[in-house]
Design a protein with these regions (language model features):
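Terminal leader/tail segments of proteins
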Residues: 1-103
Length: 103
């Protein structure tokens, strides 16, 4: 049975049994920061490969399992917008609740 992390760690830890790592600062897949979380923004740099996209979906699942539903919803929205717009970068601004997609 796979070990599930019950809390998002302060320091980088493996995401389930993947080559990706997670921390309170976000998600790193193959040495590329995919999700960066700060007090004011959540940034996504989505590399459109099947592995990185799988890591992102697992990260969203982990956030929900840890009770971080609001952050999970924002990350999932950024993920879907990157896919829909065929973009690599999207940013959520917490101050005004806006999302910007860079195509």
């Amino acid at each position: 049975m796979k070990k599930i992390i019950n809390t998002i760690p302060e320091n980088p830890a493996k995401l389930y049994s993947c080559a990706a790592t997670v921390s309170k600062k976000g998600l790193i897949s193959y040495r590329t920061r995919i999700v960066a979380i700060s007090d004011k923004t959540i940034k996504m740099h989505l590399v459109h490969t099947s592995t990185t996209m799988m890591h992102t979906r697992k990260y969203i699942k982990l956030l929900r399992a840890c009770g971080e539903k609001d952050i999970a919803n924002i990350v999932e929205t950024l993920y879907r917008m990157c896919i829909d717009h065929k973009a690599q970068d999207a940013v959520y601004n917490a101050e005004d609740g806006t999302i910007s997609v860079m195509v």
